[in-house]
Amino acid sequence: SIRLDSTLQAPVTSFGTPAPPEWNLNVMRAPELWSIGHSGAGVVVANMDTGVDSAHPDLAAQWRGGDNSWYDPHGEHATPHDSDGHGTQTMAIMVGGGVGGTAIGMAPDASWIAVKMYNDAGEATYSDIHLAFQWLLDPDGDLNTVDAPDVVNASWGLIGTAGQRITEFSADIEALKTSGIAVAFAAGNDGPAPLTSLSPANNPQVLSAGAVDAALAIAS
């Protein structure tokens, strides 16, 4: 079928001072998980975002490395790059180590790969996103190797879709799940009222992640 190849804008990135020790990890009881050996070792996490700064001290050692660990459908960067910062932030929340300070990710011993879904202008077409999903199924294009990620994170959503279920990427997501890959989407920034999560996060196929603040109030 023929459909409009819509364009998606990159999420807004917030910048601040170096982070203090992360209260959220204690709320989620991450130290208890680490103490029994669940720190992400042996797990590969993929990020669909604005890219990743692979030189970041808390992420450099965790990059899996190689041609099967980075994909830029726009052809702008042959190696990991992030001209925005959003993808580096979300990756650090997941797998950041403690080298650069006191902050640390939820799974600091996991390794990462990434798709630079948005171009340097902060835009991604639907066709770019479909290509990204396809790459994640078989990063090196060789069915005889096992190099797909264990988890895919997508901290983006289709703006203006709160309360609507858009199925544009349902087949892509289902293909990942059928391959044994866990898929997580950010619920979006339209909360905290009911029925404000965005698509694809509000699709039943995915794990949808929201947020709370330090007082455990639901974030926007």
Which role does the model predict for each range below?
Residues 21, 32-69, 74-128, 144-151, ...:
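Subtilisin-like serine protease catalytic core
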Residues 1-24, 32:
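Autoinhibitory propeptides
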Residues 123, 157-181, 186-220:
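Substrate-binding/specificity loop regions of serine endopeptidase catalytic domains
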Residues 2-5, 56, 139, 203:
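Acidic-histidine catalytic/liganding microenvironments
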Residues 24-31, 190-192:
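Short gly/ser/thr-rich secondary-structure transition/capping motifs
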Residues 7, 118, 189:
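Residue-level "edge-of-site" marker
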Residues 136-164, 186-187:
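Short acidic, glycine-rich surface-loop motifs adjacent to enzyme active sites
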